[in-house]
Regions:
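Short S/T/G/P-rich N-terminal loop/turn motif that feeds into the first structured element of a domain
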Residues: 19-199
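Sec-dependent N-terminal signal peptides
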Residues: 4-14
C-alpha cells in the first residue's frame, strides 16, 4: 500500500497539467521579447511609437504574424519602460521579425530612440512560456521576478512554483506563470509573474 501511495504522490508532483479549482497550469506556447528602455523624452518617445503604430509596416506586421505589442512602465528597475512583443510561437516570431526588420518605418522608430531614450541603458531578451495559469492578457498590473535557476534544476523549481501557487489560489485573482529566458540575459534564466486587473 505504501508503495502505491508513494507512486501516486510522485505522479501528482510531476504532473505538468495540475488543475486546482479549475485553474489549469500549462505552457501557452508563446515566445516574447522584452525590450527595456530608459525614456528621457516621453512626448517624443510616444510620438515615435504612435507614428510607427499607424504605418503600413505595423499593419502588415500585426496582420501577418498575429503579434501582440504593449508598452509597460516599470517600478523598482533601472529602466523606466519595456515594450513587450508577444508571438504565438517561434514560427510566428520568425515571420514577424522578418517583416519588422524589412521596413523603413521600424528603422526610423528605432533610430529615434537615440534622441528620446538613454540607449546605453537599453537592452532586450527573448523568453518562452513554460507554464501559464489564467489569461494574462486581461491583466494590467504585474509583479515580475527575474532569477537564475541552476542548470538542470528547472523541473524541480517549476514543480515547487506550481505547488506553491496551487496552495494559494484563494489569494491570487489574476494570472500567474513562469517563462524561460532563451537568450539575451546573462543574469537571469527564468522569470515568474503574478498579474491582476488592478493594484
Amino acid at each position: 500500500m505504501k508503495k502505491y501511495l508513494y507512486a501516486a504522490l510522485v505522479v501528482f508532483c510531476f504532473n505538468v497539467n495540475i488543475t486546482a479549482e479549475e485553474v489549469t497550469m500549462e505552457s501557452d506556447g508563446t515566445i516574447m521579447e522584452f525590450n527595456y528602455l530608459t525614456v528621457t523624452d516621453p512626448q517624443s518617445f510616444m510620438m515615435a511609437l504612435d507614428k510607427f503604430d499607424k504605418s503600413k509596416c505595423a499593419e502588415k506586421w500585426r496582420s501577418e504574424s498575429d503579434v501582440g505589442v504593449s508598452l509597460w512602465s516599470l517600478r523598482g528597475s533601472g529602466s523606466s519602460h519595456f515594450i513587450l512583443v508577444v508571438y504565438e510561437n517561434a514560427e510566428k516570431m520568425e515571420k514577424g521579425r522578418a517583416i519588422f526588420n524589412s521596413c523603413s518605418e521600424s528603422a526610423f522608430m528605432i533610430k529615434s530612440f537615440q534622441k528620446n531614450t538613454d540607449t546605453d541603458r537599453s537592452w532586450n531578451w527573448v523568453a518562452e512560456n513554460v507554464v501559464a495559469a489564467s489569461q494574462w492578457t486581461t491583466d494590467t498590473v504585474f509583479a515580475k521576478y527575474n532569477f537564475k535557476v541552476e542548470e538542470g534544476h528547472e523541473g524541480h523549481y517549476l514543480n515547487s512554483w506550481k505547488k506553491m501557487m496551487s496552495a494559494n489560489l484563494d489569494n491570487v485573482n489574476g494570472s500567474f506563470g513562469m517563462n524561460r529566458v532563451l537568450f539575451g540575459n546573462r543574469y537571469s534564466s527564468h522569470m515568474v509573474y503574478v498579474g491582476n486587473e488592478s493594484l
